[in-house]
Each structure stands twice: as structure tokens, then as C-alpha cells.
Amino acid sequence: DNFERSNFYLYLSNFLNSKFIYNYSLTVENYYLNEDYEKAKKILKNFKKEDNFYYWYRVKKEAQLIAKQRNKKESLNYITVEFNKISNPNDKILFDIANFYKNSKKYEEAIKYYTKVINTADDISEIKSDLFYRRGGSYERIGKYEKADDDLLNALKIDPDDAYILNYLAYSWLERDYKIKEAIEMLEKAYSLKSNDPYIIDSIGWAYYLNEEYFKAEKFLKRAVELMPNDPIVNDHYGDILWKLDRKIQARYFWGNVLEMDDAEKDMIENINIKIIKGLVNS
């Protein structure tokens, strides 16, 4: 198959030029994607501390393997210890550790390192736009909405046609019942740019729901749940619109789906249990 063929050529290349370290990273990625974690760990031993760039790649990948094989807390502890050994980390390493903290929901730490990279990044580069987007998302997750909005709007000043930034900011405004009209306009623009993205489809459907355009909302939310049947938020949203359209048995079915999903958050599960019993309040 493609996996075995790819590895064959990588091994051949390594045999012919064992000093071409990049090939080892491709082999690691192959094993990682194929969930052969022990072989991935074995190949990672080729990356030595003397080579800062590739050794940091090894640390990141080992942290990911720890998360897969053991737990995320141990993974975060490992990468933090290794990061703290670096006396003068470059922007790439700072960016990576910020992303790791963000993905681990350690948003204050993520913000600290994103800020360091932002302070050195080119003012109008796409990289700076991405940094504002990531830091803005971190601020949003801890409820610092003014700072979040500033960062996300700054990202859009640099890259006004980034569908994902438009989507994130607009959805945040919807959740806060803030600037609904502008949020819908942003989502319509995001949808025109990425009409097949399930997250954007869900967001625009939810915007129409909040704007009480229920038939319009159902069309988008149905498509979102078809594209992401295992996403708890999408199932929750689709259940809500079905309830509004008086399709209550179906609504409870989709709400019930959420209870079976591992990544459904605790407060969402509590809310779903109430809705299954009582339906939507004031509806």
C-alpha cells in the first residue's frame, strides 16, 4: 500500500544518504499516522541534541507520542521540562510551545509565548495575522473578550479574506449576543470563501438560528451534521433547530447523540440532559 511504498523509498534514501536527517522525520510521520508508535520512537533516536532544529522536532513528537500512549498531562510536563532547558529559544520554538499550551488549554501560558513572537514578527506578514488569530483565540477562551476582539480584528486588517478568522470572530460575537448583524455579514463572507468547510457551515447556520431565520438555519445545520456527525456542538445545534421546527423526537435524538461523545464538555452534557427532559425553555 501507499504507507509501505513510501517507507521503502525513505529507507532507500536513508541508506544512500544517512546524513539527510529530514528523511527520518518523514519516516516518523509515516509511523505516527499509521499508529505504529514504537517504531516512530525508535526512529526519533536518530535526532541528537547537537542539532537544535531536529532535536526540538524530536521533543515535540515524543510529547505527542506520550499524549497518545499515556496522557496529556504527562505530555505537557515532558515538553515543558525540555523547553525550559533551552537557554535562548528561537521564534519557531516559542511558536510551537505556545501552540502546545493552547492545545492543552493552558491559555495564559500560550498568550505569554505568542506575545513574544508577535513582538518580533513583521507588521504586515501573514505570520503576524496567524499569531494574532491564535492569541486572540486564547484570550477568547479565558473570557478576555476585548483583547480577543482587538487581536482578531488586527488579524483581519492584515488578511481580510481569511475565512477562519472571520468565522472565529463572528461566532464569538454570536455566543455573546454582540453585533449579530455584523457577525452574520462576516459569516456570509467566510462562507463565500470556504463553502465546504463544516465549521463555517455550522456557524452560519447558528447565526441564522439566533436571527430566528429557522428554515434557512436548518438547511445549513443539517449539512454541518452530515459533514461532522461526531461533533457534539454540531449535533447540539441541529437538535435545537429541529426543536424550533417542532420536530421534537428528532431533536431529542440528536441531543442524545451528544451524550455518547467523548469530547462533549461537562457543562454541555448537563445542558443536554435538561433539554432532553424539558425541551428548549421559552420555545
Regions found by a protein language model. Name each.
Residues S18, N52-F53, S87-N88, D122, ...:
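Short coil turns that delineate tetratricopeptide repeat
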Residues Y22-N23, Y57-R58, I93, I127, ...:
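TPR alpha-solenoid repeat register
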Residues N14-F15, K48-K49, N84-K85, N119, ...:
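Conserved structural position within tetratricopeptide repeats
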Residues L26, K61, D96, R134, ...:
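Canonical tetratricopeptide repeat
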Residues L10, L44, I79-T80, Y114, ...:
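Hydrophobic/aromatic packing residues within the alpha-helices of TPR/SEL1-like helical repeat arrays
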Residues L33, K68, N103, R134-G137, ...:
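Register position in tetratricopeptide repeats
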Residues E29, Q64, N99, G137, ...:
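Residue-level recognition of tetratricopeptide repeat
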